[in-house]
Amino acid sequence: MVSSNFYKNLGPRKLTAIIDFLHDIIAPPKIEDIAIHDIKILQEASPNDISFLSNPKYSEFLKTTKAAACIVPKNFTGEANPNTVLLHAQNSYFAYGKLIDFFYAPIKSYPTKIMKSAIVADSATIGKNCYIGHNVVIEDDVIIGDNSIIEAGSFIGRGVNIGRNARIEQHVSINYAIIGDDVVILAGAKIGQDGFGFSTEKGVHHKIFHIGIVKIGNNVEIGANTTIDRGSLQDTIIKDLCRIDNLVQIGHGVKIGKGSIIVAQTGIAGSSTIGKYCALGGQVGIAGHLNIGDGAQVAAQGGVAQNIEAGKIVGGSPAIPIMDWHRQSIIMKQLLKTSNSKLKK
């Protein structure tokens, strides 16, 4: 149930208006143009609601759902409640995301102003139509682009450059960074701090001063409590269209290619390079100074200790080709059964 405390329902919406809005929908030739009041999961939908199916695990619920309509994959041919209108989409999950925007808007709004409790240096440049929240600190020579939002308690260090349409949530810290347009940084993220660099001499760990920065491209999202260290000599670089989940650690000098996705609790050690459109599952570990090729994927909890060729899929720790990992898992189960049966004898 969507809470009206936080989101405003913009419905009802006519079914034909929904189809027109989503553009790439294939609908039955004749449908009743009913009013749709809300979006619900298949199990909870009523005759006034629309639902969606993107994961085939939930296709059984389509037989019993009460939804008036349901967005399904383009090639879906399974059974469904005959009273539910099936709307076939090229990408049903993408269509669902657009539908959320069509039906809901956040109640929380941001006035175009700098709150009185914010501290903004005289030499800072704040663009047009920006919101600077309570207790934000913006230091000297910072540049913030038009239409940006900096929420309460965030710190923007000297010389940082943030592009247009940024949304920086509460208690974010940004230092030594240049950030592009349309970037979202969720609460508690820390960007541009010293990396983990020490030189050991005669039993003493001496800190290496980091003189690189962090460069973040356009249309990037960085999750809550994620940390991105600045480079020691070479910059840490996050290219356009990347999506980085919560609680990710990105070490100094790491380079992440365009469109890559990094899931929660992943750690990437210093000076490793992640190619374009890579996918790293949850709790993946990447050792330092490695190269992960374009389009490579690492399954959850994979431990990567050597380079991965472009397009390869690996899993396990140490990470190996995914099919080998599956075979190993099967063999281990068989060995365990054999050893258990011998122990019983």
Curated annotation (Swiss-Prot):
It catalyses: a UDP-3-O-[(3R)-3-hydroxyacyl]-alpha-D-glucosamine + a (3R)-hydroxyacyl-[ACP] = a UDP-2-N,3-O-bis[(3R)-3-hydroxyacyl]-alpha-D-glucosamine + holo-[ACP] + H(+). Pathway: Bacterial outer membrane biogenesis; LPS lipid A biosynthesis. Keywords: Acyltransferase, Lipid A biosynthesis, Lipid biosynthesis, Lipid metabolism, Repeat, Transferase. One of its GO terms (cellular component) is membrane. The active site is at H252. CDD domains: LbH_LpxD. Its EC number is 2.3.1.191. One of its GO terms (molecular function) is N-acyltransferase activity. Belongs to the transferase hexapeptide repeat family. LpxD subfamily. Catalyzes the N-acylation of UDP-3-O-acylglucosamine using 3-hydroxyacyl-ACP as the acyl donor. Is involved in the biosynthesis of lipid A, a phosphorylated glycolipid that anchors the lipopolysaccharide to the outer membrane of the cell. Homotrimer. This is UDP-3-O-acylglucosamine N-acyltransferase. It comes from Rickettsia rickettsii (strain Sheila Smith). The gene is lpxD.
